[in-house]
Regions:
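Phosphate-group recognition and catalysis centered on beta-loop-alpha active-site segments
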Residues: 2-309
Length: 309
């Protein structure tokens, strides 16, 4: 019985991958992958963070994704992920594993030059995003963007190089410590110790590592990322908190805001998710930072539907 179920699940999963890769479902077309026009709005109404850059249009954590986000007036923050190479340098990538045809390796096992000199191939396997948007608002656009990114060749860039493409946007720098805290902090210090960090939020879901960073650099703005409601209390040790979208609680958010904390919500990949959180937050829905792969769609929807809260 277990084998049959496993085969069935494999067929379903494989079919979904094929559909996403084809880009033909429900009349999807190339035009729907372009950035939505956002006009006639006050860009101060809602705070938006472009997750890993404009990652629904360009490969995440690349200079093109950052450049696109930097040009969008409605984007307030650009989020990016930093991790260590084997020789202790910081590059921008969410996952340690990288892929190319007939090749797979880990960034942590490669030197900075090896990582940044090689081209890799991007593959998206986020089936949940596909199914969540089959019948949802802006679903065609979201699914089409997802399919158009598959198979694109890209380059991993260093942290300093990536920041050059962010213009005057604020930065959410997600720190992938991976149990290498001391070496990671030293790499951060090499880059930021003599620089103005007033527009940078250092964030991580590793509370121990982030507290160490905050202890030795109290002047750096640090935000804890939480995915479980039992960890919300960690906010008292940091300057801000990033809350996973499915554990948002209006009472907690209001208290955090009243205490001067930055509150961000992650990561929005459908309009239905935006509606659920904005409804839960009520009058505070315009006081938080929305982190999303679809900054154009999310901003436009929020302004049109929740601007009177």
């Amino acid at each position: 019985m277990g084998l049959k179920n496993g085969i069935k699940n494999l067929i379903v999963y494989g079919s979904a991958i094929a559909i996403i890769g084809s880009g033909f479902c429900f009349g999807l077309n190339q035009a729907s992958s372009e950035v939505e026009t956002v006009d006639n709005f006050s860009y101060e109404d809602f705070d938006i963070a472009a997750h890993r850059g404009f990652s629904s249009i360009a490969v995440e954590n690349t200079t093109r994704a950052f450049d696109l986000a930097s040009q969008a007036l409605y984007v307030d923050y650009i989020e990016m992920d930093a991790r260590l190479t084997e020789d202790g340098k910081l590059v921008l990538a969410h996952d340690d594993e990288v892929f190319a045809p007939f090749y797979k390796n880990n960034i942590s096992d490669m030197t900075y030059d090896e990582v940044t000199d090689k081209s890799f191939t991007y593959y998206s396997d986020d089936i949940k995003v596909y199914f969540d948007n089959l019948f949802g608002q802006d679903g065609k656009t979201i699914i089409n963007r997802l399919s158009n990114l598959n198979g694109i060749t890209y380059n991993v860039v260093g942290l300093e190089d990536g920041l050059e493409f962010c213009g005057d946007k604020k930065i959410l720098l997600d720190l992938k410590f991976d149990d290498n805290v001391i070496k990671f902090v030293e790499a951060l210090e090499d880059i930021f110790e003599l620089k103005d960090t007033s527009n940078i939020v250092f964030q991580s879901d590793d509370s121990t590592a982030l507290l160490y960073l905050k202890t030795i650099h109290p002047e750096w703005f640090c935000s804890i990322l939480v995915r479980d409601s039992k960890d919300l209390e960690l906010v008292e040790y940091f300057d801000g908190i990033g809350i996973r979208k499915d554990i948002v609680d209006e009472e907690f958010v209001k208290a955090a805001l009243d205490n001067g904390k930055l509150v961000s919500i992650w990561t929005f990949r459908s309009i239905d998710e935006v509606n659920k959180v904005a409804t839960e937050l009520g009058n505070n829905c315009d006081e938080v930072l929305y982190i999303t792969d679809y900054p154009d769609l999310v901003f436009k929807h929020l302004v049109k539907n929740y601007n009177d809260k």
